[in-house]
Amino acid sequence: LNIHLTGLQDEEFHSRPAMKGLHVYHESGVWRTDWPETEEYEIGPPSISWLTWHITYWWSMVLDHSFGSGTLTREEVLSMGNIQETRDRINRLKDEWEREVAGLPGEALLSMERTRWPFEDRPFHELLAWLNIELMKNAAEIGYYRFLYAVSKK
């Protein structure tokens, strides 16, 4: 992920790959995000600002539901509105995630005790794998759009 966020500036961060697609918007002093009702291709491609919010959303929700109070909702996970604060937030979440997971005894990975969101009744190691896939998918999408953005500016 860091390779795709390095050198990223706010102009590219807020650019849209298409007129239609998931994005963030500033409303009443708060950066809010679109939320898809479907994952069909017709919704359009997401912007980098939306993808980075999506990363903070997944990590924040899983951290809260696996290691915290379990009360955090999607609406409470707001976009930061700029790339520097977003990078800082992603790094804080990464550090917190590594600290929490590293502190678990091995048997906790086989337990279902911490698997509370977005699914239950599965060993915690399956949640770890699922989260890694989601984060890497978002990172790949950011990288792909950065290629498109770079050639469009030439």
What residue spans do the PLM features occupy?
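Acidic/histidine-rich alpha-helical segments that form the ligand environment
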Residues: L78-L110, E126-M136
